[in-house]
Amino acid sequence: MEIHELQQLLSEMSLQEKIGQMVQLTGAYFDKEAVLTGVVGEQLPPEWIIQYAGSVLGVIGKDKIYDIQSRYMEQHPHHIPLLFMADVIHGCRTIAPIPLGQACSFHPELVSEAASIAASEASSEGLRATFSPMIDVSRDPRWGRMMESFGEDPYVNGIMGKAMVDGYQQKADTGIAACLKHFAGYGAVNAGREYNDVEISQRTFLEQYVKPFRMALKAKPAMVMTAFNAIDRKPISGNKELLKGLLRDKEGFEGTVISDWGSIGPVSYTHLRAHET
């Protein structure tokens, strides 16, 4: 669509429809036979959120995607299609080594080729975006996501991250949108515990944990994902200084900033920030 067509569409959308476009749900919410019980069932979003949701996580298989997309398009007032995304981390149908293993190759061209193959297979299934690459500098083996990173070196993370973004996005007909994650400092959480605070100096943060992003952003990834953690007791997902001041204004990122799985809620109830933050 042209810019003027998008502007016209936005002007015709209700507030609920615009909010819905910013919500991502799992495929279970669109499964006609699924019965959501327990905690998930108790936390079902309002019906209009499901009706106007903008994207879907983790549905694999072109037949499933086609079925959900067809039913969704029929009932959406503006027929805006869903965006299907998944964690295509180290391959889709053809599996490559985990990112930590790929880093050991010191071969960015090969890493880029593996990402290109994964993108081609994923796009043929109807997926349009992946939550990869993860370029968190990772030095604490207690942290449960070590294997998803390229290891302890900022430079290696940056080079391999850029290569992977190039591989995912380089082909217009078979490429998928890449997502750099997790901005920033996620690999330095205290004691390797998820959602924990990060307590490092500003210099270390910028020179070691932001550096890979600065390098990989040169490949122009479509998305950047925020980190679960807080730094200086400020949760990243609600940190204007980092997300706007550093990422957008200083580093020049013009793509989409996306939050991690359910990370908006913890801004208040995990990191104990005021609801007005």
Predicted regions and their residues:
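Glycoside hydrolase catalytic-domain context in secreted enzymes
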Residues: 1-274
